[in-house]
Regions:
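Primarily short, surface-exposed interaction patches in extracytoplasmic proteins
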Residues: 139-145
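Short, hydrophobic/amphipathic alpha-helical patches that form generic packing surfaces
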Residues: 123-128
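Acidic, aromatic-lined catalytic clefts of primarily extracellular/periplasmic carbohydrate-active enzymes
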Residues: 1-120, 133-134, 147-186
Length: 186
């Protein structure tokens, strides 16, 4: 985190409400659209085997057990909403910390007081991982331009619209694009 400054209220209640709505709650493990075993509010159990609390299955994941094979091992396992909330918050905080280190545009947005726009990046990192977000090089460059007054926030939204993520993600992408353009939570 730059200069050890205290964090503003990130994640905000608005971001957490967005994630609940956009991810939806599933008590039982399922395969998401990419074939990844997921539970709760979009928690990727393949990326976070520590949430399994099953040492034998956690070890299998670390050795490469994925998809339907992992799902079969988890048959009958469920999460409460409280467990899902705790995992979601933990993941959001991990994403936030990674963005502070790896995404200068996130830091600039936070420092400029553009928290709704910063949380668009945090929402996207939660959805696709920090590495996935960092592939949006054109959009991140447009954010720099908007912060410097070289282009508009509408241009940043247009950058998002040109991505495969936009076409695949639908309602969520449209809401986050609008939030980036307006600076108001969608």
């Amino acid at each position: 985190m730059p200069d050890n400054k205290p964090l503003p209220n990130i994640p905000s209640p608005e971001l957490l409400a967005q994630l609940r709505d956009q991810e939806g709650f599933r008590a039982s493990p399922y395969l998401d659209t990419q074939g990844v075993v997921t539970i709760g509010y979009g928690t990727n159990l393949e990326a976070h085997p520590e949430y399994l609390n099953l040492p034998d299955v956690e070890g299998m994941v670390r050795r490469g057990l994925r998809g339907r094979l992992l799902l079969n091992e988890l048959t009958g396992r469920t999460w409460s909403r409280e467990r899902a909330e705790a995992a979601m918050l933990d993941e959001v905080v991990q994403c936030r910390e990674a963005l502070y280190v790896r995404c200068p545009q996130f830091v600039r947005l936070v420092e400029a007081g553009e928290l709704p726009r910063a949380e668009v990046l945090l929402n996207m990192a939660y959805n696709m991982g920090v590495s996935g977000l960092l592939k949006f090089k054109n959009t991140l460059s447009l954010i720099d331009g908007a912060l410097d007054g070289r282009n508009s926030w509408a241009a940043v939204e247009s950058g998002l619209k040109s991505s495969l993520w936009w076409r695949q993600t639908g309602r969520r992408a449209r809401a986050l694009g609008r939030q980036m353009r307006t600076g108001v939570y969608a």
